[in-house]
């Protein structure tokens, strides 16, 4: 099933140069826009103390997710779909390990941590994470399961970092603590 879904999505690559440019943009440049936009949003927060708290939780969650993804890739290497001769590769990845997707893990941790503070922004960042993951499958550098696993791992880490922060530093006012 993983391979079937991959081939269906990857078959969209190479059909139209403009579509390929958009895929490349969402897979490689769009993530920087999301990070920059989030940084501006959190740094210019009207309540500086809450903005600093939100920034600390979100950055910690994203960094922890990135570290976990790197660790899994190191200990459980899994080749990218680009090793198949039928794969249409639109760009070259940084490394040859695909599981889990570091991008999916990182960008799933952001909305998971943000959700508890800024639900509307978290929704848009979750949509951004979906676009990034889809583009990385279409671009031929990730299997669908790599992306799905990244979303699950990132979501758990994002929520977990929020939970740990609340346990040690926050007032237990959120409904999950009641």
Give short role names for the model-derived ranges.
Residues 18, 49-54, 118-124:
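Membrane-helix interface segments
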Residues 12, 16, 45-49, 74-83, ...:
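Membrane-interface elements of multi-pass transporters and channels
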Residues 1-34, 69-96, 176-178:
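N-terminal transmembrane-helix/juxtamembrane module of multi-pass inner/ER membrane proteins
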Residues 91-178:
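Membrane-embedded catalytic cores of phosphoryl/pyrophosphoryl-handling enzymes
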